[in-house]
Amino acid sequence: MLERLENCEKRFIEIEEEISKPEVINDARLVRTLAQERADLQDKVEMYRRYKTMAKELEEAKNLLESEKDEDMRGMVRGEIENLEKSLTDLYEQMTFELLPKDPNDDKSIIMEIRAGTGGDEAGLFASDLYKMYIRYALLKNWKTEVIDINGNVAGIIKEVVFEVNGKGAFSRLKYERGVHRVQRVPQTEASGRIHTSTATVAVLPQVEEVDIDINMDEVRVDIFHSSGAGGQNVQKVATAIRLTHMPTGLVVCCQDERSQLKNKNKAFAVLRARLMELEQSKVDEERTESRRAQVGQADRSEKIRTYNFPQDRLTDHRIGLTAHNLPHILEGYLDEIIDTLATHEQTELLKGED
C-alpha cells in the first residue's frame, strides 16, 4: 500500500509541475482535468506525508530509548512511542480506506427523479412524501434545491417530479437512494383499516457539465408549449414550457417550472446531458453505474430496495438488512444514520475486494 501512496505523491508533484506550463495553461479542458486529478490525490498525499513524518519520529524515539540511561526519560520516551504507534496504526487504516476506488461523480450535484409506481393515489402521496424528505435532507445539508418539472395536483399527489440538488457531495450521499421504495400503511380514506402497499421509484443522476458530453443539436427536437401549471395570464399568452426529444435514444425531457422559456430550455438540457451521460457510463462499466432505465425500473413491488412500514413504525433497507424506527423523524429528512450505514457497508465490501 505504501508503494501505491508513493506513486500518488510522485504523480501529485508531476501535476503541480505540468499545470504551470504555458502550453497547459492555454488548454482550459486540460487544466480542468489536471486540477480534478490533483484534488483527488491531495488527501492521499497529505496522509502519506503525515505518515512518513510520524514513522520517522517513531524511529528516532526508538533510537533514543536504546541510548537513554535515565529511567524517568525512558518512561517518557516509552509513552511517546506508544502514542506514535497508535497514531500510525489509525492513520494506516485511514489511508487504506482512502485508497479504495472512488466514484468519480461523488463530489457532484445531482438531478433526482421520483415517480409514483403501483398503488394509485397512495403511490402518488408516497412519492410526495419522498420528495419532501429529500428536500428537507438537502436543507439540513445546506444544499440548494430547484424544481425542473413536476406533475402533481393540489391534493398532494405527485405522479412525477424532477429536481436539482446543488451542493458538493450530493451524489456521494444520495446515490444510495436510487431504486424502488415501498410503503405499507393504512390510507386515510380506508374505512376498514386495511393496509395498502404502494411503490415509488427514485433515480439519482450526477449533473454533467457541457464540456463533459457533446450533444448533436440536429438530433434533438425542441417543442415549445403552454405550461400546464399555475402561472396566471402569462401562461395563457406565452408558451414557455420546453420538451426535448433526443431522437437516437428516445429520451424525452420536459421543463415547465420557470416563466422564462430560456431558463426552461437550459434546465431541460441539463437533465438531458445527465441522462445521456448515465447511459454512456452504463455501457462502459455496467458494474459501477446502472443505467437510468435500470435505476427507474418498472416501479414493481418485487424489486424494492427499502420498505417503510407505518403500522410497525419501521424502515427496512433490504440491501444490507438494516432496520430503523421512528418513521416521522426519518421523513423529516434525518437520513444520515441510514446513509452512513450504507456507505460503510460499501467501503467494507470494497476493502474485501482489495484483499
Curated annotation (Swiss-Prot):
Please name every pair of cysteines joined by a disulfide bond in this record: none
Compartment(s)? Cytoplasm
> Which residues does this entry mark as bearing N5-methylglutamine?
Q233
Q: Looking at the keywords, is Metal-binding present?
A: no
One of this protein's Pfam families, by short name? RF-1
The task this protein performs is described as: Peptide chain release factor 1 directs the termination of translation in response to the peptide chain termination codons UAG and UAA.
* Protein name per UniProt: Peptide chain release factor 1
In its UniProt entry, the species of origin is given as: Dehalococcoides mccartyi (strain ATCC BAA-2100 / JCM 16839 / KCTC 5957 / BAV1)
Source species taxonomy = Bacteria, Bacillati, Chloroflexota, Dehalococcoidia, Dehalococcoidales
